[in-house]
Regions:
Chain A
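Extracytoplasmic copper-binding redox domains, predominantly the cupredoxin/blue-copper superfamily
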Residues: 1-231
Length: 231, 304
C-alpha cells in the first residue's frame, strides 16, 4: 500500500501572497507585447530564472509556472536552468507552488533596448493582479493586508451520497479602505480570488481550527428504569 | 479363463473412493491485472461427499462431490484516484476559460489500496463427472536394478499394478455464494481506506473522504460491481481468475495420475513366510478391469 500526501498542503496554516507556497497562486496580466525576464526568489536566494515572450501571435491566454518545479537548490550547488515561456500579450502569467515549503516571490522585468525595468513584483500586487487561495482546512481564518483584516470561515463538506464538488470560487477585493466583503464563508477546497484596487499583499492565517468531527457517530444503548429492589 | 478374479461391490468402491477423496488437500494461487484493479487468490481445496455409481459401460459416475474452499483469500488491488484541489475557472469567456487556477494534488501518485477478502467457506461448488479405470504398471524409481522381489518388498520399493480413475469429463457447478459476501466486501473497503488515511489528521481524513464521495460506492464502481455481487464474484473467480478451472484440473490430476485408488504389489504375496521358509509370491500379468452396474471386477493371470 503506497500513498503520497502533499504534507505541506495538509500542514499549511498560513498563506502569503508575498511568499508564495502551496495552495496559493498569483495571476498577473502581462498587458504589453514584449520580451520579459523573470527572477524566481526563495527568501533571499535566486533559485530560478525564466524568459517570457508575450505577443498577439501567441494563442495561449495563460502561462502557468510551477515555481517548485523550476527552482534549483543553490545551497547544494544545483544550478538553476533558464526556462522559456510564451503567452498572448492579453493573457496572464500564473505562478503557483505544487509542493514543498514555498516562500517564493518573482520579479518580472521587461527587456528594453538599453536597460531592463521591473514591471511586476509578486510581493506587491497591483490593480489587475489576482491572488488565488484554496483553503482546505475547516475553521476560521483571518485575511490580512496592511491595516485591514477580514474573516473567512471555511466549512467542512457535508457528508453526502455523492463526491463533494466545491462551489465556484468566491471573490474578495483589496481596496484602500480594506477588504470587501469583510466576511466570507466558503467550503474547504473552494477557491477564493482576491482582486486588487490598491497595491497590497495578502496573508491568510488559520486562527481557529474547526473542532474535529468523528467520522461515525457513536451510539450506545442505555437502559432506563427503576431497579427492582426487594428487601 | 483368467487365473485370478477379484470383485468389489459399489459400496466397497464407494468406501475406497472416500478414503482417496479424504486424502485430497491441494493449494493453488493465481491472479491477474484487469485495468482499474488487480486481483489474486490463494486457495486451499478439500473434497467432501460425492456419490459413486458404477455404470455398465465400464465407467464410474461421480456426482455431487463438494469442493470445500478452505482457505480462500481474494486480494483486490485498487488505484484510487488522485485527490486534487483548484483547477477552477477564474475568468470565463464564451470561447472557453481565459484564466484557470492551477491544480494542486494533496493526495496523489495513485495510492493503492489492497482489500483482502476471506471467502473461506462462503462459496459452495460441486464436481460431477465420469471416470474410466486405467491400469498402469509402476516400477519404483528407488528400486536398484537386480534387487530381488523379496528384498524390494522389505525395502518398500516393490513393483505395483495400479488402478487410476481417469476422468472422461468433469463439470464444476457453482452452487451458492453466501449473501454475506457483500457485507464483508464493504467492511473490508472501509478498513482498507481507514488504514490508508489513518495517519492523517481527522479533518484531512474527512475532507478526502468527502472529495472521494461514498468510498464503498467508489470502490464498487472501480471494481465494476453492479447490483449483484454474487454474479460479479462468480465471474471474477470463475472466468477472470480461472479458479474453478484450476480446481477441476487439480481434482482430475489427483485422481488420474497422482494417487491410485487401488494397487497390488507384483509379484503378489500368496503365502506368508514360515519358519525357515520365505514368502511365496506369484507374478501378476494381464491385469484388467471390468465395471458393471453392480461391481468392479479385476482379473489377472499368473505368469512370469
Amino acid at each position: 500500500m503506497k500513498a503520497r500526501v502533499n504534507t505541506c498542503a495538509v500542514q499549511q496554516s498560513c498563506l502569503q501572497s508575498s511568499a508564495l507556497g502551496v495552495l496559493g497562486s498569483i495571476a498577473h496580466p502581462v498587458g504589453r507585447p514584449g520580451e520579459y525576464s523573470g527572477r524566481v526568489m526563495q527568501g533571499k536566494s535566486q533559485v530560478a530564472e525564466f524568459s517570457l515572450h508575450a505577443g498577439p501571435d501567441v494563442d495561449a491566454t495563460q502561462v502557468t509556472i510551477d515555481l517548485a518545479r523550476i527552482a534549483g537548490s543553490p545551497l547544494v550547488g544545483q544550478p538553476y536552468k533558464a526556462h522559456k515561456y510564451s503567452v498572448n500579450s492579453d493573457g496572464y502569467l500564473m505562478l503557483f507552488v505544487s509542493e514543498g515549503l514555498g516562500g517564493f516571490w518573482v520579479q518580472l522585468s521587461s527587456q528594453g533596448t538599453y536597460r531592463s525595468r521591473v514591471v511586476f513584483d509578486s510581493r506587491r500586487l497591483k490593480s489587475g493582479d489576482l491572488f488565488i487561495a484554496t483553503l482546505i482546512r475547516p475553521g476560521t481564518h483571518q485575511a490580512k493586508m496592511p491595516r485591514a483584516v477580514a474573516a473567512i470561515r471555511v466549512r467542512a463538506p457535508e457528508a453526502s451520497d455523492k463526491a463533494f464538488q466545491p462551489p465556484p470560487p468566491a471573490g474578495m477585493t483589496c481596496t484602500k479602505t480594506g477588504f470587501v466583503p469583510k466576511r466570507l464563508e466558503v467550503y474547504a477546497t473552494q477557491g477564493i480570488v482576491f482582486g486588487f484596487e490598491t497595491t497590497s499583499r495578502v496573508q491568510i492565517d488559520l486562527t481557529k481550527p474547526a473542532p474535529a468531527r468523528s467520522a461515525k457517530s457513536r451510539r450506545s444503548a442505555r437502559w432506563r428504569g427503576r431497579p427492582d429492589i426487594r428487601r | 479363463m483368467n487365473h485370478m478374479t477379484v470383485a468389489a461391490s459399489e459400496q466397497s468402491f464407494q468406501a475406497v473412493f472416500n478414503h482417496l477423496r479424504d486424502g485430497f488437500h491441494e493449494t493453488a494461487s493465481g491472479g491477474g491485472d484487469f485495468g482499474p484493479f488487480s486481483a489474486s487468490y490463494d486457495v486451499g481445496v478439500r473434497l467432501e461427499g460425492g456419490t459413486i455409481d458404477l455404470q455398465n459401460n465400464n465407467t464410474v459416475l461421480l456426482s455431487e462431490l463438494d469442493i470445500v474452499y478452505d482457505p480462500l483469500i481474494l486480494r483486490l488491488g485498487i488505484d484510487i484516484p488522485e485527490i486534487c484541489v483548484g483547477g477552477f475557472c477564474i475568468i470565463p469567456s464564451p470561447f472557453g476559460c481565459i484564466l484557470r487556477a492551477p491544480r494542486i494534488c494533496i493526495f496523489s501518485a495513485d495510492p493503492d489500496i489492497q482489500i483482502d477478502l476471506d471467502l473461506s467457506g462462503l462459496i459452495e461448488s460441486e464436481i460431477s463427472g465420469t471416470f474410466s479405470i486405467d491400469t498402469r504398471y509402476f516400477v519404483d524409481p528407488g528400486r536398484p536394478a537386480g534387487m530381488s522381489d523379496h528384498d524390494a518388498q522389505d525395502a518398500d520399493v516393490p513393483n505395483k499394478w495400479q488402478l487410476f480413475l481417469n476422468p472422461g469429463w468433469l463439470d464444476i457447478d457453482l452452487i451458492d455464494i453466501a449473501d454475506t459476501v457483500g457485507n464483508i466486501l464493504d467492511a473490508a473497503i472501509d478498513a482498507a481506506i481507514d488504514g490508508l488515511l489513518g495517519w492523517l489528521p481527522g479533518w484531512a481524513r474527512s475532507l478526502i473522504r468527502a472529495i472521494l464521495g461514498p468510498i464503498v460506492a467508489l470502490v464498487r464502481a472501480i471494481l465494476d460491481i453492479a447490483d449483484d455481487i454474487q454474479e460479479w464474484l462468480s465471474n471474477l473467480l470463475g472466468i477472470s481468475l480461472g479458479l474453478f478451472n484450476t480446481v477441476v484440473t487439480l481434482v482430475a490430476d489427483y485422481f488420474a495420475s497422482r494417487y491410485p485408488f487401488l494397487e497390488f504389489e507384483d509379484p503378489i504375496q500368496v503365502l506368508d513366510p514360515g519358519v525357515n521358509l520365505i514368502a511365496v509370491k506369484v507374478p501378476i500379468r494381464d491385469l484388467d478391469v471390468l465395471v458393471t452396474d453392480d461391481e468392479m471386477v479385476v482379473t489377472a493371470n499368473v505368469g512370469a
